UniProtKB/Swiss-Prot annotation:
Name of the coding gene: secB
Localization of this protein: Cytoplasm
Classification via HAMAP family: SecB
Protein name stated in the entry: Protein-export protein SecB
GO BP terms, alphabetized: protein folding; protein tetramerization; protein transport
InterPro entries referenced in this protein's UniProt entry, alphabetically: SecB, SecB-like_sf
Protein source organism: Ruegeria sp. (strain TM1040)
């Protein structure tokens, strides 16, 4: 009898469905600063990767646009000269159903970028290689930490906005 109750409880929860309907590069910029300035010799790159996330509801029911923005700057460790700058805005169009409303925001900004990440990694690797550098293979990005940091930042700003 306990098994029937457990089966009934799980049957009532909606099944989460997520489909990637499309994905594309919205904006891409690569500047080989090293070649433009004529920097030569041995360089030891120091790479800084900044990630920004955004999600928007589309006009079609259950469709969302998830945007991952990467800003990558590589500098020479020795002199601090900029070697290259890569800016990428990558978009995924998702059809999502069965996610409770209170869990939708983290789902969009954690799970969706996680699904897109292998494609982002390949693009960054190809662009850096095609730009005259060794392929830059990004480490895994902790989208949960990025989400939590953004929530903490917004909560810290909220009292300041109320008092102003």
């Amino acid at each position: 009898m306990a098994e029937n109750g457990a089966a009934e409880g799980t049957a009532q929860q909606p099944q989460v469905q997520m489909n990637i309907l499309g994905q594309f590069i919205r904006d891409l910029s690569f500047e080989n600063v090293m070649a433009q300035k004529g920097v030569g010799g041995e360089v030891q790159p120091d790479v800084n990767v900044q990630v920004a996330l955004d999600a928007k509801k589309r006009s079609t029911e259950n469709q969302y646009e998830v945007i991952t923005k990467l800003n990558i700057e590589s500098k020479n460790k020795a002199g601090g000269e900029v070697l290259f700058v890569l800016e990428l805005e990558y978009v995924g169009i998702f059809n999502i159903a069965g996610v409770p409303e209170d869990q939708l925001h983290p789902f969009l900004l954690i799970e969706c970028p996680r699904m897109l990440f292998p494609f982002l990694r390949r693009i960054v690797s190809d662009i850096s290689r095609d730009g005259g550098f060794p392929p830059l293979n990004l480490d895994n990005i902790d989208f949960v930490a990025i989400y939590r940091n953004e929530l903490a930042r917004r909560q810290a700003e909220a009292p300041a906005e109320v008092t102003n």
